[in-house]
């Protein structure tokens, strides 16, 4: 599936007892949890905005003062809205300490970044494709988070990651996969799919992975009902060694105010 707009969350699931990372596609009716090898996110030309030439965004390097393709932290109806959550009922039940998204690499033209903004505090970089080391982001239990995703160049791209978690019995689980993007209006979704199949290729968009069943109860009540209002209040929970601990609550009133304070449409 190629997804060009609407709400998408990646999140850990237990499918037939297997710990995996899937993408919940709310643009489908009913919503469905898709394999990350099938879901290709197109970041359209309408997402291009001016990157602030401000020291607060020094982690964006030469991208400052230039136009870039941005999936915003707060929803823009013209653009796909990518986040993550740990709200699947079986994850809430079996992984009380949440899970980690560990970013391990980027393939494709230019640079890719992800960062989060929290009101008047300085933006915090969560992922920088120019760094070679693993970059872990902790996902608190039963939370739903959105961040800013920034791409410098158009074209097919992937971001490799591994989801890791320790269940209530102390058993460690991990699952490597890739998020697949086509940046810009041109380019083929198939190009992104052909950039190396990941372990998630074995997980199909089957009835066991659909989001229209009881598996959506927690996430629907806590967050997705407010997606149309496009408001986010992000809470930074702390930093432990190199892991960034992030929690977020979905609000219902502020639309694009947080984004417009620093990101001006080009």
Predicted regions and their residues:
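Extracellular Ser/Thr-rich, low-complexity/disordered mucin-like segments
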Residues: 205-239, 249
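C-terminal membrane-anchoring or membrane-association module
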Residues: 234-266
